[in-house]
From Swiss-Prot:
InterPro entries: Aldolase_TIM, OMPdecase, OMPdecase_AS, OMPdecase_bac, OMPdeCOase_dom, RibuloseP-bd_barrel. GO terms for molecular function: orotidine-5'-phosphate decarboxylase activity. Homodimer. One of its GO terms (biological process) is 'de novo' UMP biosynthetic process. PROSITE patterns: OMPDECASE. It comes from the Bacteria. It comes from Methylobacterium radiotolerans (strain ATCC 27329 / DSM 1819 / JCM 2831 / NBRC 15690 / NCIMB 10815 / 0-1). Transmembrane segments: none annotated. Belongs to the OMP decarboxylase family. Type 1 subfamily. Pfam families: OMPdecase. This is Orotidine 5'-phosphate decarboxylase. CDD domains: OMP_decarboxylase_like. The gene is pyrF.
Length: 230
């Protein structure tokens, strides 16, 4: 696990919202209770990439969850473009050619995270998609490939975090979605964990969306999660 001085940096708030205006309103409500925000497809296609630059200019950290996967040159140039946004993290799918291209394009300030297997997948989903391995084995294989290629960190479920840590060692980042405070609904995530359990499992950053974005007091929820992560 990497050393992180400010426990707020361990929480990544997922801005899974339909507009930049909604995202900015949420960020204002959260205030200094959070320092790290994730922008994915929904917001990214609605002006979120420009928002990423503005947030970075304010000293906030940004995770571009774009899950790139294409031919090598396209990924390399896409990563190179994303590096100009000021983002801290960018995701790619954990296919060897994609990861190698991302490493070539990342530049100095951007960290590349490889998505092993989506946290909405279980073994039945993996089989339906044509993978010949159960989820745990597929995650382990992709984690080992990512470490060999030089990826900065892995995105995996909390259920696989321990095995991933053993494979990639102490210095690579582990980022985990599907984190739910105690008592929160799992939603469409199938492999979940509480923030405190995630911290004890050696996870560096947790991604939390709906429990914060849908809360009556998102600042209070963010503060409670950070306290659980400290």
């Amino acid at each position: 696990m990497t050393e992180i001085a400010d426990p707020r940096d361990r929480l990544i708030v997922a801005l899974d919202l339909p507009s930049v205006q909604a995202a900015e309103a949420l960020i204002d409500r959260i205030g200094d209770a959070a320092t790290f925000y994730k922008i994915g497809y929904q917001l990214g296609y609605a002006g979120g990439l420009a928002l990423a630059e503005r947030l970075a200019a304010r000293g906030l950290k940004v995770f571009l969850d774009l899950k790139l996967h294409d031919i090598g040159n396209t990924v390399e140039e896409g990563v190179r473009s994303a590096s100009g946004s000021g983002a801290t993290f960018l995701t790619v799918h954990a296919y060897p050619q994609t990861m190698r291209a991302a490493v070539r394009g990342r530049g100095a300030g951007l960290r590349i995270l490889a998505v092993t297997v989506l946290t909405s997948y279980d073994d039945a989903d993996a089989a339906e998609a044509g993978y010949g391995l159960p989820v745990a084995e597929l995650v382990a294989k992709r984690a080992a490939q990512a470490a060999e290629i030089g990826i900065d960190g892995l995105v995996c479920s909390a259920a696989e975090a321990g095995s991933v840590r053993r494979i990639v060692g102490p210095d690579r980042l582990i980022v985990t979605p599907g984190i739910r405070p105690a008592g929160a609904e799992a939603g469409d995530q199938k492999r979940v964990m509480t923030p405190g359990d995630a911290r004890r499992a050696g996870i560096d950053h947790v991604v939390v969306g709906r429990p914060i974005t849908g809360a009556a007091d998102p600042r209070a929820v963010a503060q409670a999660i950070v306290a659980d992560l400290a």
